[in-house]
Swiss-Prot record:
It comes from the Bacteria. Gene3D superfamilies: F1F0 ATP synthase subunit C. It comes from Caldicellulosiruptor saccharolyticus (strain ATCC 43494 / DSM 8903 / Tp8T 6331). The lineage of its organism: Bacteria, Bacillati, Bacillota, Bacillota incertae sedis, Caldicellulosiruptorales. This is ATP synthase subunit c. Keywords: ATP synthesis, Cell membrane, CF(0), Hydrogen ion transport, Ion transport, Lipid-binding, Membrane, Transmembrane, Transmembrane helix, Transport. It is a multi-pass membrane protein. The gene is atpE. GO terms for cellular component: plasma membrane; proton-transporting ATP synthase complex; proton-transporting two-sector ATPase complex, proton-transporting domain. F-type ATPases have 2 components, F(1) - the catalytic core - and F(0) - the membrane proton channel. F(1) has five subunits: alpha(3), beta(3), gamma(1), delta(1), epsilon(1). F(0) has three main subunits: a(1), b(2) and c(10-14). The alpha and beta chains form an alternating ring which encloses part of the gamma chain. F(1) is attached to F(0) by a central stalk formed by the gamma and epsilon chains, while a peripheral stalk is formed by the delta and b chains. PROSITE patterns: ATPASE_C.
């Protein structure tokens, strides 16, 4: 049962992967349209990607804790 719970916890990684993929596509599209805005787009993208990736890291930690029964 705990393995199922850990698997469900890791479903957050699916959403994060899709979200970061969409954000990357939009950032690349924005830079393609306005190359002079590269300096403003890239830092915002990295901040957004880091915040989204934090969700995946938290779900991974929760899954590990569930499997190890800590």
């Amino acid at each position: 049962m705990t393995a199922l719970a850990a698997g469900i916890a890791m479903l957050a990684g699916l959403g994060v992967g899709i979200g970061i993929g969409i954000a990357t596509a939009k950032a690349a599209e924005s830079v393609g349209r306005q190359p002079e805005a590269y300096g403003r787009i890239l830092p915002l993208f990295f901040i957004g990607a880091a915040l989204a990736e934090a969700v995946a890291i938290y779900s991974f930690v929760i899954a590990i804790l569930l499997v190890l029964k800590v």
